[in-house]
From Swiss-Prot:
The keyword Protease does not apply. PANTHER family: SEPTUM SITE-DETERMINING PROTEIN MINC (PTHR34108:SF1). Interacts with MinD and FtsZ. GO terms for biological process: cell morphogenesis; division septum assembly; regulation of cell division; regulation of cell septum assembly. InterPro entries: CAP/MinC_C, MinC, MinC_C_sf, MinC_N, Septum_form_inhib_MinC_C. Belongs to the MinC family. It comes from Aeromonas salmonicida (strain A449). It holds the Pfam family MinC_C. Cell division inhibitor that blocks the formation of polar Z ring septums. Rapidly oscillates between the poles of the cell to destabilize FtsZ filaments that have formed before they mature into polar Z rings. Prevents FtsZ polymerization. This is Probable septum site-determining protein MinC.
Amino acid sequence: MVERDNELKGTTFTISVLHISDGKPERIRQLLAAKVAQAPQFFNCAPLVINVERLADIPDFDQLKGLVESEDFVLVGITGARDEAMKTAAKAAGLAVMASGKSRKVEPLPLPEPTPSPVAEVKAAPAPLVPSKVHVGPVRSGQQLYAAGTSLVILGSVSQGAEVIADDSIHIYGALRGRAIAGAKGNTQARIYCQQLQAELLSIAGTFQLSDALPAGLIQQPVHVRLDNEQLRIDHIK
C-alpha cells in the first residue's frame, strides 16, 4: 500500500451568508428559525457566514456564535468587516475573516515540462450504466427518497414536507411541493424537472433556493432547473 503525503488543496463550497443590519439576537434567531423550518434536514449543521458590512458597532461574536449554533447552524466566519477592530474581535471568537465576493485566481508558477516517455495506449472500459431509480406514486410528507449514483424519476407528486434526493438529475411527473436536491454529491450538470413548481427548496450541487425566492410567474408551472454561473436558473417548459 502506497502512503500519500498530507496535502493542502483549494476547493469551493457553497455557504449561506446571513446579512445583518443590527446585532439584536432575537431578530437573528427568528430569521434562522424560519429558514430551518422550511428545510430542516438541509440546514442541519449547515455552515454559515455572517456579513457584518451594515453593522455600525462591533457585536458580541461569542454570543452571536452561540445563538447561531442553537439554531443548528455552524458559524464559520464573517465577511464585510471594514475595520481591524472588528476583524480582531471576530478572530478572538475563533471565527474566520473572509473576503467579500469572489477572489482573484492565483496563477501557478510554470513548471518545466517533463520529457514524455512512450506509453502504450490503453483503452478504458466504458463505465457501467446505472439505471435510474423510478418511484411510482406520490411521495408523502415526511418521506425521503434517495437515488445513489443515478437519476430519480417520480411518477407522481412530491408532497409538502417530503424530500427527494439524487446524485444525478430529478424528474417529477407531477407537482413538486416538497424539497428536491439534485447533484447531491457535487454533480453540477444535474437538473431538476417538474410539471408544477411549488417547491419548499430546490438544490443542485449545494446551490439552493427556498420557496420565498422562487419567481412568482413560475409558481405552479412546468419548469426546468439548472446551474448557470453558480446560480440556479429556473426556466418555463413550454
